[in-house]
Amino acid sequence: MNQTRKVLVLADSDNTRIAAQSFNRKMDWEKLRNYLANPEEGRELIEMVIYVGMPPAKERFVEQRKFTEKFSYWAKSNGFMVVEQEGKAKGNEYQADVDVVMAMDAIELSLEIKPDIVVLVTGDSDFAHLAQKLRRRGIRVEVASVEQSLGKDLKNSANSVIDLISIFDEFRSKNGRKEHFRIGHTNVFD
């Protein structure tokens, strides 16, 4: 009999949303959660944390902030743990670095809840050292991303890579049409 493995999922919302949009898909967080912690594969989801960069509370970001607040509320209402990081204005854009917060939480939560697997939903190579650190503690690290946004250092630091192209194909198209955008084949990361 297979033993159930405890899974902790940590997702960079902006990185993941942009990856889905690059395939003309609307992000479906519930499908993603079910895909990454499938109980039929002997996985038990302990927690899924979504890291959200909040637009600054300034007049020029009002609409973006409302949209992001609405998403955060939805995610919390649907069983996700949400960590919001206030952004800083940089001209007409803003930057809300969730990387440091996500990395610190990954270490802290891993020490506290002792997952068997940590899934990092990001392609950002800034998380390569985190992946190595978790692996040194005996935790399996999986990176969920698409090839186009997966940094080489992160790919090489993880135990394995989960190709999100197949799950993105199940998401609703942003324009409502049924389109499929497969790049390569199912073993694109091998």
For each of these PLM feature ranges, what is it?
Residues M1-D97, R140, S149:
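Domain-level signal for Mg2+-assisted phosphodiester chemistry and nucleotide/NA-binding surfaces
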Residues V62-D190:
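Nuclease catalytic cores that cleave nucleic-acid phosphodiester bonds
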